[in-house]
Amino acid sequence: MSIINMTDLDLAGKRVLIRQDLNVPVKGGKVTSDARIKASLGTLKHALEAGAKVMVMSHLGRPTEGEYDSAFSLQPVVDYLNDVLECSVSLASDYLNGVDVKAGELVVLENVRFNVGEKKDDEALSKQYAALCDVYVMDAFGTAHRAQASTHGAGKFAPVACAGPLLAGELEALGKALHNPARPMLAIVGGSKVSTKLTVLESLSNKVDQLIVGGGIANTFIAATGNNVGKSLYEADLIPEANRLLAAAKDAGGNIPVPVDVVTGKEFSEQAQATLKAVSDVADDDMIFDIGPQTATELAELIKNAGTIVWNGPVGVFEFDQFGEGTKAIAMAIAQSNAFSIAGGGDTLAAVDKYGIEDKISYISTGGGAFLEFLEGKALPAVTMLEARGA
């Protein structure tokens, strides 16, 4: 990859515009989960300590483009940064014609999605962003799969475009896992729908030595093997695809393990009674909400022997404790493994957090959609742009 790294540049006295992913949950004007901001702090501190005039841009939520809405303002992020950084941090809401920023100061530019043309990668808006800086830094892996004015267009027209440490680290970790993995390589793909992750399953099935499916995705595979799934979430129209993937894995000398025991409930609620059953005993009015202990033990053994682990998606409804034992067992097996492990996706990160294994995962990806598209082998527009600018 011919990408320029921000850390290799002399930033002293330069106007540096950093696109970060500060799209954090806010309630009552306060940031309620600061993981993304914390992940971004290293980049900000490096630029500030290098003597740069630092501007940061990000989106927050999904406001109506072209309209200011205080509910989507980055002011709570500015308040947070003022508490944790030792420099002046201010918010600029009218910035397209220029920003007054001094060396060692930080100016946060108001939500880019308030600007008309942001989502469409508008060329005129991109050029306005680019004119604000001497150096454009793309550091938001979570939005690298979107070709938008702040993530893509601005970098095309800026005098210099480079990758920030967060983005560079993410690409390096994912590249290590996918392009030169320690074997055996194992991928866990969970979540609710096969349809949204079918291309991921297909792409990974050609790369990994062992594919594990969980959640609603596993229900479709259970149905494909001729078992009743009752009222469980599954996709009947994708049973042929599941059978094709099962057959392909077998032809390659491997297999996709289908749960042998499951935990069921009669309703989707925190109060639902959990019942352990053999997969062949699921009743018509049952809903499968987790894998059973025998399945969890078998999967944990596969995880224990892996050289590389990619984890995207829980294997059960872990938000409800009675249906969380399967995901907990998977999480603990990954934590105890000596493999190089990567976890990504919102629900996965919530599980990592719930079971307290953050420091046992080799790399935690900040991207959701971008993480999946990278796993699929798709080119990420922001990365392609940085490669072109670095050539």
From Swiss-Prot:
- Please report any disulfide bonds recorded for this protein chain, giving both cysteine positions: none
Tell me the pathway.
Answer: Carbohydrate degradation; glycolysis; pyruvate from D-glyceraldehyde 3-phosphate: step 2/5
Biological process (GO) annotations? Answer: gluconeogenesis; glycolytic process
State the PROSITE patterns in the record: PGLYCERATE_KINASE (PS00111)
Query: What broad class of enzyme is this?
Result: transferase
EC numbers listed for it are 2.7.2.3
Q: What is this protein called?
A: Phosphoglycerate kinase
Q: Which organism is it from?
A: Pseudoalteromonas atlantica (strain T6c / ATCC BAA-1087)
